């Protein structure tokens, strides 16, 4: 979403005014790459223009911004979905999150401008519960509450980026998968097809990003 703080985050971690930042939504018109190398590893951050509501897409350049945002998702290994804490989950956030999910990308939800929210000891948990409902179609995605302006929890964001990348790239041996499958079938019997019990032969993992599994059964 425009003006959620994506460019401010890039500038904070880069330590320079790498991307134009202003209070005007949509300042970033193009996707720009920033290479960062630190104690967490080497990263290439792709900053994009946010996706606007349809009613606000009045210029051809905005159409290109939407296309470039989706192209950035296609290029990325991990998608950091930046939310504005003062606005919560919006239609535009849903679109980009849904696209990243459909493309099988590792994702992290970063709730920005957390320093501007009035809080008590329950605020974060209440916000997290609401986000879990909003992101019910992506229940596997971790959340982090940050401030791109102050740098609050940026280290945690790095950790989650590395963690989700590792999870999405994970390859599990066929032997381990079949041990798990054998245990599962002792607990729950395979379903029946037209009155005949299905027999599961084995499971394998043909690919990663995202981890994909194929189970071989009779009558399939």
State what each model feature region is.
Residues 1-46, 54-67, 71, 75-82, ...:
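C-terminal-of-GTPase-core extension/linker across diverse P-loop GTPases
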């Amino acid at each position: 979403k425009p003006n959620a703080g994506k460019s401010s985050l890039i500038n904070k971690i880069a330590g320079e005014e790498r991307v134009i930042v202003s209070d005007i939504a949509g300042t970033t018109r193009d996707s720009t790459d920033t290479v960062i190398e630190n104690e967490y590893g080497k990263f290439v951050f792709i900053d994009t223009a946010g996706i606007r509501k349809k009613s606000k897409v009045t210029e051809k350049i905005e159409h290109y911004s939407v296309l470039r945002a989706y192209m950035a998702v296609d290029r990325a290994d991990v998608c950091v979905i930046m939310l504005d804490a003062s606005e919560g989950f919006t239609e535009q956030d849903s679109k980009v999150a849904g696209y990243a999910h459909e493309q099988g990308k590792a994702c992290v939800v970063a709730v920005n401008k957390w320093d501007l929210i009035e809080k008590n000891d329950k605020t974060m948990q209440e916000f997290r519960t609401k986000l879990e409902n909003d992101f019910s179609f992506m229940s596997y995605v971790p959340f982090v509450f940050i401030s791109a302006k102050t740098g609050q929890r940026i280290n945690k964001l790095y950790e989650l980026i590395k963690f989700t990348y590792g999870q999405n790239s994970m390859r599990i041996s066929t032997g381990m998968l079949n041990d798990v499958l054998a245990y599962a079938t002792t607990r729950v019997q395979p379903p029946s097809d037209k009155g005949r019990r299905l027999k599961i032969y084995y499971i394998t993992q043909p690919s990663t990003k995202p981890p994909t599994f194929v189970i071989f059964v009779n009558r399939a």
